[in-house]
């Protein structure tokens, strides 16, 4: 499944209609990560704090806007909710909201915290720690969650680089890389 950004993904400014409106990303970048993480975390708990901290970790309004372009939690959540059950690592009977949503969020939210070129493998222990902090009621053990976290990380990494991304999807006769 190739990710094509369409008109609905342009985050139009509600006043001007211009694409690329990320008032949260821009404001968060300007205010700083700590305040943003705390504010969003108060609403969304540990998972909200993770996402808010990732967006706020990049200092400055312009950098915050760039982070907002790469990580739009609404777009990521919709994408993964539509895709998770088609992946090679999907476990029958596990649902998106409880089991997989926190895993994808660990991947995409944490990617923004590291410099370009940082690999998943080089920060895997940090990601595992983050998983245990935000997993909530997810039934996924680290080894199972790791694949979804990697997909969230890799998709965000590709979006930052302006590249297309395809997760590992099931095929009719087995499994194949996406």
Q: Language-model segments: what does each one mean?
A:
Residues 1-178:
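Intrinsically disordered, low-complexity, hydrophilic segments
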């Amino acid at each position: 499944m190739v990710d094509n950004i369409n008109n609905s993904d342009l985050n139009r400014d509600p006043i001007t209609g211009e694409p690329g409106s990320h008032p949260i990303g821009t404001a968060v970048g300007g205010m700083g990560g700590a305040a943003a993480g705390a504010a969003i975390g108060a609403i969304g708990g540990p998972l909200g704090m993770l996402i808010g901290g990732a967006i706020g970790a990049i200092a400055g309004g312009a950098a915050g806007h760039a982070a907002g372009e790469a990580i739009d939690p609404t777009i990521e959540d919709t994408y993964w909710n539509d895709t998770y059950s088609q992946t090679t690592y999907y476990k029958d009977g596990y649902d998106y909201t409880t089991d997989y949503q926190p895993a994808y969020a660990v991947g995409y939210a944490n990617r923004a915290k590291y410099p370009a070129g940082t690999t998943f493998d080089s920060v895997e222990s940090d990601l595992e720690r983050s998983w245990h902090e935000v997993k909530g009621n997810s039934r996924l053990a680290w080894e199972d969650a790791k694949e979804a976290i990697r997909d969230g990380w890799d998709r965000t990494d590709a979006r930052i680089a302006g590249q297309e991304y395809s997760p590992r999807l099931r095929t009719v006769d087995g499994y194949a890389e996406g």
